[in-house]
Amino acid sequence: METFKVVETFVSINGEGKKAGRLAMFIRLKGCNLNCSYCDTTWANKRDARCELLTAPQIVERIKEAGVELVTLTGGEPLLDENVSELIGSILMMPKVEIEIETNGSVPIRYYKERDNRLTMTMDYKLPSSNMEENMCLENMEYLKPWDVVKFVIGSREDLNRAKEIIERFRLCEKAIVYFSPVFYQIQD
């Protein structure tokens, strides 16, 4: 049975996005393929970061014990794990549970194009201040659903202008929910 490198699990009130205010279990998987300038979880992406090796049934058991109906798979980048679809499938076997996948936008989501609204993608689009924009998987824009979220982390006026370009180019407001999130102490007048 496959195992997943889990650096932490915790229950908290979701603080951002479409599901803000809801109680959620966060499952943070180890590893990321990007190195964003403003990353707030670099510790979870280091090679020597401590983690538990958990199977999908063990993770499902933790979700059941927590008694929540919203699970947020985050990282790092949770879609890097080649077996994450097994974990997603196991979690969705729980009838009332919804999953929100926080993805950095660099990994293809086409494998999840056939899904209902119990599986939501919250996808970052990395802007110039992240130093990672060249890694964005633009084909992901084709696979967004109306219940998905595209999040732009804004660290400069250049970022704001670029976000506007991307929103217009891909007609994102017609495809998904769009959010801006500021990088604190970055934008100057």
Which residues does each predicted region cover?
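A short beta-strand-turn-helix
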Residues: 12-17
